[in-house]
Amino acid sequence: MEAFPPTVLPNIAYWNVTNGTWEYQVQVSWPLNWTTRDADSSVETLYVLDGNALAQTATEAFRKRRPVEFGQPDAIVVSIGYPNLQPDSPYSDGRYYDYQMPVCDTCPPQQDAPGVPSGGEAFITFLDTVLRPWVHDYFPNAAFQRDGLYGHSFGGLFVLYALFTRPDLFDVFLSASPYLVWNEEYFFSEHSPLFNNDTAVGNATTKPALQLSYGGLEQAPRKRRTETQEEYETRRGFLAALKMEDLCTRLYDQIKGSALLRDVELNVYPFSYHAAVGGNALADGIDYFLDW
């Protein structure tokens, strides 16, 4: 038996990391032109949620972009996944804890994952005080510049929670198909961090930017050739109830003039469903991340 050559997964490493509650599978990738982790270079860093599903997508998107984007800066991708996954799925039950924002003390408990408490605050602390310093130590000579955070679906909702709770945490926030219907649209309630943010973020050059994305077929799907009418109506009813287009548009309209943000962009994929947006918005979001 012969081991794979280093060209199979070059400049990629994996670790299991714990915050004391959950164990994470962290994948870190760095530029192909680096022959050592001690490279002396300025770098941008993108942190990606649901790493089991999206780590390679993010890594390859940066690498495929490099040959045709001559001015692309060096970038490191830090993807946060889990070692234990749901059956036949790239997702873990841990995400329902880590990505879940807290609700007010007098609010009824959320019913999307009954009995699972909020771990959003603890996860922000983990990203900021454990994972990011560790990444900086792993590349001792890198000059770290800007950081971005990407999340899709429930991860996209966490990105919004992090943005309005800790706008200083990342320079660019990328939220794809955020699960805004969660807990009876709690994010639009008077208790949401959307309306309760007193964080001062300094002058315009330090304010974060937000790209919000969704697919045009998420709320209004087309009938598939192989579907019966009954199957289509069932699927259509389920997707319509998620109100992806309505809620993303509503959020964009509410925050597009916000003094908290230096830029807000709404990116619509007219022919994409929910799952496809996860990869599309990540690859396209690189442009926004590097530009803003």
Whereabouts are the PLM-identified features?
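Non-catalytic cap/lid and distal C-terminal segments of serine-dependent acyl enzymes
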Residues: M1-W292
